[in-house]
Curated annotation (Swiss-Prot):
This is Putative ankyrin repeat protein CBU_0781. Residues 197-242 form a coiled coil. GO terms for biological process: symbiont-mediated perturbation of host transcription. Residues 7-19, 325-338 have a biased composition (Low complexity). It holds the Pfam family Ank_2. Residues 20-31 have a biased composition (Basic residues). Keywords: ANK repeat, Coiled coil, Repeat. SUPFAM superfamilies: Ankyrin repeat. Residues 1-31, 319-338 are annotated as: Disordered. Gene3D superfamilies: Ankyrin repeat-containing domain. ANK repeats lie at residues 92-124, 125-157. It comes from the Bacteria. It comes from Coxiella burnetii (strain RSA 493 / Nine Mile phase I). InterPro entries: Ankyrin_rpt, Ankyrin_rpt-contain_sf.
């Protein structure tokens, strides 16, 4: 019995051995609720006739059949495929969306995506729907999948999508390749090889698109890094100013002769000074001029505390050997820039 023949035990109105049109089966809703046995080369396998109708509908671009099955459908799991329900696939591991992407069936792919079809399922060849659209030059379907946020960072056999696109380049496919590259670049595809080298195209027009996009990415990256450095600098400056105020306040309030190590303010002060020393030390490594003035202005204030820590034992949990405020340590890191 061929795959397109309907078993007599399933639909009694069909004579044995005759073919039943798929369209007529589809209009009956779910004609087969159980999986009949289909013989192939004398080997019986379980075959889902309902899903086969859908697969054939995709190949023949029968949008009405797909839409009928998507309305109140109980077995096309759509977005649930990404959770605990395994997706329905054909023998190649293709879902309906992957099949639509391969064949370039734009309207069917759109109907499936609108119904919530999961985009990142991988077939037995390691392809997602987006990879299939790239490999088969399905530009409109590719744009549609990108619009539905398909993952453009995915790799196929170690290659990113831009490498895969350029690998299939030829003079006959130049226009398709150009449009695919434009779409992928706009979507944020990776523009470097895995070893960090720049991806380049043999075609000058395509290579210029990639080069311009890469330069733009570099500019944006440098801008983000500059903004981050500015935020870090501002944060450090605010911290320095706050600690300076604390030092000046406590220095005025506590005479040098008084044992400040026994005062309630000392633990917090000690923490603030330690933090300050660390900030200035790190900042001088990055930019010696940036915090030079702040470092010099605090040497005198910290010098007194350093001398006190040298002369006296620190009470409580604060131990002399644990501090960074000994004269040899704290003052050396706060010395004028070298």
């Amino acid at each position: 019995m061929s795959r397109r023949e309907t078993p007599t035990s399933t639909i009694s109105s069909t004579p044995t051995g005759t073919r039943t049109p798929r369209r007529r089966l589809s209009r009956k809703g779910h004609p087969v609720r159980r999986s009949p046995l289909i013989a192939k080369n004398s080997i019986f396998t379980v075959f889902d006739l309902s899903f086969e109708i859908l697969i054939n509908a995709v190949e023949e671009n029968s949008l009405d059949i797909i839409k009928n099955y998507l309305r109140g459908d109980s077995f096309h799991q759509t977005a649930k495929w990404g959770l605990n329900v395994p997706p329905k696939t054909d023998f190649q591991g293709d879902t309906l969306l992957i099949k639509a992407a391969k064949k370039g069936k734009f309207l069917i792919a759109k109907a499936l995506l609108e119904a919530g079809a999961y985009k990142e399922i991988v077939n037995k060849l390691g392809e997602t729907a987006l990879i299939c659209a790239v490999r088969h030059f399905r530009v409109e379907t590719l744009d549609l999948l990108i619009q539905y946020h398909a993952d453009v960072k995915i790799k196929y056999k170690g290659q990113n999508l831009l490498e895969l696109t350029l690998e299939k380049y030829s003079e006959k496919t130049k226009n398709f390749t150009l449009r695919i590259v434009q779409s992928l670049v706009a979507a944020g595809v990776e523009l470097w090889h895995s070893d960090g080298s720049q991806i380049m195209a043999s075609d000058k027009e395509i290579d210029e698109i990639i080069r311009n996009a890469r330069n733009l990415q570099i500019i944006k990256k440098e801008k983000r890094e500059a903004e981050e450095r500015a935020r870090t600098k501002k944060s450090k400056q605010i911290t320095l100013q706050r600690i300076q105020r604390d030092l000046e306040y406590i220095s005025k309030r506590l005479p040098f002769e008084e044992n400040i190590l026994t005062t309630p303010d000392f633990p917090q002060l000690f923490f603030e000074i330690s933090k300050l020393v660390e900030i200035i030390s790190d900042s001088q490594k990055e930019n010696k001029e940036e915090f030079a003035e702040a470092s010099i202005s605090l040497i005198d204030a910290l010098k007194n505390f350093g001398m006190i820590l040298e002369k006296r034992d620190v009470p409580g949990e604060v131990k002399k050997e644990d501090t960074t405020l000994s004269r040899n340590n704290s003052l050396s890191c706060l010395s004028s820039p070298r």
